[in-house]
Amino acid sequence: MFAETIAGRWTAEKANKWYAQYPWMAGCDYIPANADNQIEMWSEATYDHATIDKELGWAEQLGFKTLRVFLSSIVYAHDSQGLKTRMDDFLSVCASHGIKPMFVFFDDCWNAVSSYGPQPRPLTGVHNSQWVQDPSCDLRLDTAKLYPQLKRYVQDILTTFGHDSRVLMWDLYNEPGNSHHGTTSLPLLRNVFILARQCHPQQPLTAGIWRDTKDFKPLNDFQLSNSDIISYHDYHGSIRHEQEIKKLQALGRPLACTEYMARTQGSFFRTIMPLLKRHRVIAINWGLVTGKTNTRYAWGDPHPDGSEPDVWFHDILRPDGSPYLTQEVNFIKAQTK
């Protein structure tokens, strides 16, 4: 790797010392079942303390100790104090259930353009039909205007919560380069690391690699050269997943798998969770309670009539908290106890 390293990156020794204070952790990428995207989760009119408290109680019963949660720059732009107040409330709910979440700032996945206010209804049977990229792509061309706005957002959040012991870590950018952005996302990725380092948070920073192809090498090299904790996404089966773990272990830093478990892709709790536990990799699967994001449906396999998929893609629980697969839930509890 010959990527630039922004000043302030933790040494491997500091990162490993930080990780040594924690037992092995499992958790999930989380959004409440009644929100269809990040904007709906965090907006004042739709933030739902009671549902979050209920669902995190179920997460606690599974033995989950962390969550990965996506923030919203659009909500911040329209209601900065409100977003921080709701984040504080969310962290209090997490703490009451023994959970330390990580927060995600930027995202290159799904819908390119988004707006504040009431969100479109989810498309029946379509995976993540209303999830939004962040920042909205219509804002990205005018970087002279956008970057100062993002500076205020990122640094206000990190100044407010960067020394809050309820936060596990900061995931600065989800899947940079996705949605055909490619290396055009590198300036924004670099920018968010610079902004975050200037705040000197007590928690580690990361940005997970997710596609190991030649065209993504500039992004991957930058992410691996700047993350305090190495994070990655892997929806493959156990053999290929373990190869990825061993390759990343050579970097000498703690590892977090921040997305896995897609049943129809061959990524199962029963095969991947024990692998992650054995290698002491933080295990974060996509989805807790199935709901408006429709992530029980697979990528590219819509069910416009709303019929149930033969096999759920993501998610663990039904909206009433009952398991999709009782045997699977029992297995998760056995791994996390």
Segments predicted by a language model, with ranges:
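Structured C-terminal subdomain patch of bacterial secreted/periplasmic proteins
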Residues: 297, 301-302
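Short amphipathic alpha-helical segments
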Residues: 243
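Active-site mouth of glycoside hydrolases
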Residues: 2-227, 233, 238-240, 251, ...
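Thiol-/selenol-based redox modules, centered on thioredoxin-like
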Residues: 333-336
